[in-house]
Swiss-Prot record:
Belongs to the glycosyl hydrolase 5 (cellulase A) family. The keyword Cytoplasm does not apply. This is Endo-1,6-beta-glucanase. Optimum temperature is 50 degrees Celsius at pH 5.0. Stable when incubated for 30 minutes at up to 50 degrees Celsius, little activity at 75 degrees Celsius or above. One of its GO terms (biological process) is cell wall organization. Its main location: secreted. The keyword Endoplasmic reticulum does not apply. Keywords: Cell wall biogenesis/degradation, Glycosidase, Hydrolase, Secreted. Disulfide bonds: none annotated. GO terms for molecular function: glucan endo-1,6-beta-glucosidase activity. It comes from the Eukaryota. Endo-1,6-beta-glucanase that has highest activity against the beta-1,6-glucan pustulan. Also active against the beta-1,6-glucan lutean. Lower activity against laminarin (beta-1,3-glucan with beta-1,6-branches). Little or no activity against gentiobiose, yeast glucan, lichenin, scleroglucan, curdlan, barley glucan, CM cellulose, HE cellulose, pachyman and pullulan.
Amino acid sequence: WLSGVDKIRGVNLGSAFIIE
């Protein structure tokens, strides 16, 4: 998974592929 905020956002959206 990504680190920091990206990881948390990934969990919230039900996806571990959130990259912004």
